[in-house]
UniProtKB/Swiss-Prot annotation:
The gene is SRGAP2. Residues 855-866 have a biased composition (Low complexity). This is SLIT-ROBO Rho GTPase-activating protein 2. Residues 181-211, 698-726, 837-936, 983-1012, 1029-1071 are annotated as: Disordered. GO terms for molecular function: GTPase activator activity; identical protein binding; protein homodimerization activity; small GTPase binding.
Length: 1071
């Protein structure tokens, strides 16, 4: 029998096999389902592609129709003229050609999209239908093949099951036969053992009886042994037979198992792959590839056709040429634009003389008229040349505006990684509303100025043409055609004489000296045109060898002086920048690195003569100094290059004037900025060097300037001992309001904080310390404690002025109307001088200037009983009015004395153009009447002259204000000034903001002393004594003070320090 444990094991084996077969059968079923699902998805995809291209074909057809309608709409308007114009292609204007090509492109796109729609409907969609049908048919056949393969695999698995059962059966029989054989062997051994024991127990009795017993027992034992041996032999034969069958069955099972595993492996690895590749997907991807490539071919050909049309349009756009269009227009309408016939002389009543009569009675008149015409032409040409330069600079600005490269919209077609829609960049593009508004405003303003200058230039050229024709005919008649321009020859000879006698020409040195003294902060310097009459006067004076700008007089228009300097360099026979180095310099401009550009410019310029380099070094050092005041004069290096560049370097003939001028401007700007790195140092090249440190004494040392007298030197030494005592002690101040610094240089503090002031840095700033940090402190946000005690500020030039007792009527007159005759213009010049003197480390010239102020102030002194003045007066330092004034006193009175008109603010003087020639002439006349003699003056005579001059000046100012209200002063480079917000109605506690609103102070209030802070302020500021009450509430300033532009050296003369009012409501000391 077989053991129960063996049967249990057989059952487990069979159960495991059945489970494995079931899993395979389920897997085969899922495989067929998955293939069915793929087939359905494939059919659905092909159906979607058909629907997509069908809808796209409809859209393309609609788009084609709309494009055709659009093209026909505009072609109908231009067909009549178009037929005429296309008869001759050369008569088609370039904009019209662009328009025709654009319409043709639209029609071409319409035809292309119609073709594309037809391809979608009749080519691509049928391909997808065919692919769908083929895919479904092939899948059915593939499914049959797959089902057959699965049936074969299940058949192999069933065969393996049968062989396994047979193996189990034969193996069980073999085990059973083996156990029976072992049992028979045990019985045989047991029988043999019993026989041996019986023989041992029996005792032998007689020999005969023993022999008989033994024979019987042997016979019995033999029969039992034989039986056992026979049984053993049978069982042995049975075991051998079953064992052989079990071995054969096992071998058959192993062979079937190997075959089954090979079949399963082949089905999963090879059969399924071949079924999907060669049956299910047979031709599917290839057919789909051909259909989609048909789509790509259609789209690419559409794109190619579109690109061909766009290339034609691009060529037409590149060929947009105003000059060619002008020529075509004139050729098309030749009869309209051709010059008419000349007017012929029509004799009257038989008068046949058709030429000028140069006989003796009229010869002198013709000669005089020819000379007048020549002089007039010289002036007009200069004026027209100035207008032309301005017009060309404005044209360059317009070209920069209209040619800005803002047409690239590639950023709008950039897609994000998530395949979202096109980026919205409207706010950053050209079409943003703020950008359009600003661009249009700038463009319109520039265009208005350009057409104004163009009209002025054309009118001037017309006049020059008429006068030139008359002049030429007169010259021809008088036989003077060979005569050259006398004024030009005289000027050239004078210039050559000046150039040969000194390194820096007189006109250059004198103009730069004057501008450095009085015009560094003049708004629009070198940009605003001056008076041509005054330019000619100054130029003629220089040609005669004179220096009309020598001395301290300031009755010249700053713009006219700047025009003289530009005119000089423009008229040089040999310009500073020769034309043979033009291309080398233009090559330097293309370098992006500023240092490398400067190095290459230096190499190019070093080949020039030393005299030219000295003049260049002098000029560009001055221009660099001037550009440091760009916040006041609105002239940064780029603006200076635009206005001054054409005068220094002209574009050679044969070059594009507009494009080359932009490179010239960039070159001049680079030289202005990098002049120290470009030009040789004084050690490398000896010669005059422009000095920035306060031009007053520097230019007085010039061979063309005035020398300082011995009296001035003595007074400087005396004044130095008195001003150096208080230079070391700082001033304590209290913060009136909270202030937060806008830069690292400005200090931040809270209201009530204690501040330490070192010195006055500008009109609106102090240099001081707070919480151990040094920096700038705004003047309007603090109260200086020294002023509350009635003590005049330290280091103020006013502290050295002695108060002189005068009759009461003189004091009233001085307060009421003893104004400087030159009005606001001279006040501006004086304050500009003070600003320049602040930047000078030397104190001698500053004391000299304030010494002059003391002479000028002797006619407007305050009450001698004022405690603020009496505390700091020096008893013998000031002469009385009845004594003879020093040499420089009368001239400088016009700058610093009589503060009535000094109440004009800087912006008001700029707005009203108080530095116009008319006001200066009036001011000069008034000054010459009352101050230009060196004999003792009577105070009443001075007061009467001043009152008469003031009345005349105010009348002129009223007239000028009415004219300036409609006068437009254009700006070439479109610098934008902040609108002036000064109200014409002035509060009772403030100073008048304009000479037209100046009121005479006739109430004899005691002790009004002018604050020393007016040395840097434009508005006239007075400090009331403690008894004066201010009713206005305390408020912080409406606007923050403008940071000043400091020189490179930190040494500031103590003579320019000033104090503030202790009252927070006294805003008259600020601008």
């Amino acid at each position: 029998m077989t053991s129960p444990a063996k049967f249990k094991k057989d059952k487990e084996i069979i159960a495991e096999y059945d489970t494995q077969v079931k899993e395979i059968r389920a897997q085969l079923t899922e495989q067929m389902k998955c293939l069915d699902q793929q087939c359905e998805l494939r059919v659905q995809l092909l159906q979607d592609l058909q629907d997509f291209f069908r809808k796209k074909a409809e859209i393309e057809m609609d788009y084609s129709r709309n494009l055709e309608k659009l093209a026909e709409r505009f072609l109908a308007k231009t067909r009549s003229t178009k037929d005429q114009q296309f008869k001759k292609d050369q008569n088609v204007l370039s904009p019209v050609n662009c328009w025709n090509l654009l319409l043709n492109q639209v029609k071409r796109e319409s035809r292309d999209h119609t073709t594309l729609s037809d391809i979608y409907l009749n080519n691509i969609i049928p391909r997808f239908v065919q692919v769908s049908e083929d895919s479904g048919r092939l899948f059915k056949k593939s499914k049959e093949v797959g089902q057959q393969l699965q049936d074969d695999l299940m058949k192999v698995l069933n065969e393996l099951y049968s062989v396994m059962k047979t193996y189990h059966m034969y193996n069980a029989d073999s085990i059973s036969a083996q156990s029976k054989l072992k049992e028979a062997e045990k019985q045989e051994e047991k029988q043999i053992g019993k026989s041996v024991k019986q023989e041992d127990r029996q005792t032998p009795r007689s020999p005969d009886s023993t022999a008989n017993v033994r024979i019987e027992e042997k016979h019995v034992r033999r029969s039992s042994v034989k039986k056992i041996e026979k049984m053993k032999e049978k069982r042995q034969a049975k075991y051998t037979e079953n064992k052989l069958k079990a071995i054969k069955a096992r071998n058959e099972y192993l062979l079937a198992l190997e075959a089954t595993n090979a079949s399963v492996f082949k089905y999963y690895i090879h059969d399924l792959s071949d079924l999907i590749d060669q049956c299910c997907d047979l031709g599917y991807h290839a057919s789909l590839n051909r259909a989609l490539r048909t789509f790509l071919s259609a789209e690419l050909n559409l794109e190619q056709s579109k690109h061909e049309g766009l290339d034609a349009i691009e060529n037409a756009v590149e060929n947009l040429d105003a000059t060619s269009d002008k020529q075509r227009l004139m050729e098309m309408y030749n009869n309209v634009f051709c010059p008419p016939m000349k007017f012929e002389f029509q004799p009257h009543m038989g008068d046949m003389a058709s030429q000028l009569c140069a006989q003796q009675p009229v010869q002198s008149e013709l000669v005089q008229r020819c000379q007048q015409l020549q002089s007039r032409l010289s002036t007009l040409k200069i004026e027209n040349e100035e207008v032309k330069k301005t017009m060309e600079a404005t044209l360059q600005t317009i070209q920069d505006i209209v040619t800005v490269e803002d047409f690239d919209v590639s950023d709008c077609f950039q897609y994000s990684n998530s395949m979202e829609s096109v980026k919205s960049t409207v706010s950053e593009t050209f079409m943003s509303k703020p950008s359009i508004a600003k661009r249009r405003a700038n463009q319109q303003e520039t265009e208005q100025f350009y057409f104004t200058k163009m009209k002025e230039y054309l009118e001037g050229r017309n006049l020059i043409t008429k006068l030139q024709a008359k002049h030429d005919l007169l010259q021809k008649t008088l036989g003077e055609s060979q005569r050259t321009d006398c004024s030009l020859a005289r000027r050239s000879s004078t210039v050559r004489k000046q150039d040969s006698s000194q390194a820096i020409p007189l006109v250059v040195e004198s103009c730069i000296r004057f501008i450095s003294r009085h015009g560094l902060q003049h708004e629009g310097i070198f940009r605003v045109s001056g008076s041509q009459v005054e330019v000619n006067d100054i130029k003629n004076a220089f040609e005669r060898g004179e220096d009309p700008l020598a001395g301290d007089q300031n009755d010249h228009d700053m713009d006219s002086i700047a025009g003289v300097l530009k005119l000089y360099f423009r008229g040089l026979e040999h310009p500073l920048f020769p034309k043979d180095i033009f291309h080398d310099l233009m090559a330097c401009v293309t370098m992006d690195n500023l240092q490398e550009r400067a190095l290459h410019i230096r190499k190019v310029l070093l080949v020039l003569p030393k005299t030219t380099l000295i003049i260049m070094r002098y000029l560009f050092a001055f221009l660099n100094h001037l550009s440091q005041f760009s916040e006041e004069n609105m002239m940064d290096p780029y603006n200076l290059a635009i206005c001054f560049g054409p005068s220094l370097m002209s574009v050679p003939e044969g070059h594009d004037q507009v494009s080359c001028q932009a490179h010239v401007n960039e070159l001049i700007k680079t030289i202005i900025i990098q002049h120290e790195n470009i030009f040789p140092s004084p050690r490398e090249l000896e010669g005059p060097v422009y000095s920035r440190g306060g031009s007053m004494e520097d230019y007085c040392d010039s061979p063309h300037g005035e020398t300082t007298s011995v009296e001035d030197s003595t007074q400087d030494v005396t004044a130095e001992h008195h001003t150096s005592d208080d230079e070391c002690e700082p001033i304590e101040a209290i913060a009136k309001f909270d202030y937060v610094g806008r830069t690292a240089r400005e200090l931040s503090f809270k209201k009530g904080a204690s501040l330490l002031l070192y010195q006055r840095a500008s009109d609106d700033w102090w240099e001081g310390r707070h919480n151990g940090i040094d920096g700038l402190i705004p003047h309007q946000y603090i109260v200086v404690q020294d002023t509350e005690d009635g003590v005049v500020e330290r280091s103020s030039p006013k502290s050295e002025i002695e108060v002189i007792s005068e009759p009461p009527e003189e004091k009233v007159t001085a307060r009421a109307g003893a104004s400087c005759p030159s009005g606001g213009h001279v006040a501006d010049i004086y304050l500009a001088n003070i600003n320049k003197q602040r930047k000078r480390p030397e104190s001698g010239s500053i004391r000299k200037t304030f010494r002059s102020d003391s002479h000028g102030l002797s006619s407007s002194l305050t009450d001698s009983s004022s405690p603020g003045v009496g505390a700091s007066c020096r008893p013998s330092s000031q002469p009385i009015m009845s004594q003879s004034l020093p040499k420089e006193g009368p001239d400088k009175c016009s700058i610093s004395g009589h503060g009535s008109l000094n109440s004009i603010s800087r912006h008001s003087s700029l707005k009203n153009r108080l530095d116009s020639p008319q006001i200066r002439k009036t001011a000069t006349a008034g000054r010459s009447k009352s101050f230009n003699n060196h004999r003792p003056m009577d105070p009443e005579v001075i007061a009467q002259d001043i009152e008469a001059t003031m009345n005349s000046a105010l009348n002129e100012l009223r007239e000028l204000e009415r004219q300036s209200s409609v006068k437009h002063t254009p700006d070439v480079v479109l610098d934008t000034l902040e609108p002036l917000k000064t109200s014409p109605v002035v509060a009772p506690t403030s100073e008048p903001s304009s000479p037209l609103h100046t009121q005479l102070l006739k109430d004899p209030e005691p002790a009004f002393q002018r604050s020393a802070s007016t040395a840097g302020d434009i508005a006239c500021a007075f400090r009331p004594v403690k008894s004066v009450k201010m009713a206005a509430p305390v408020k912080p300033p409406a606007t923050r003070p403008k940071p000043t532009v400091f020189p490179k050296t930190n040494a500031t003369s103590p003579g320019v320090n000033s104090s503030t009012s202790p009252q927070s409501t006294d805003k008259s000391c600020t601008v």
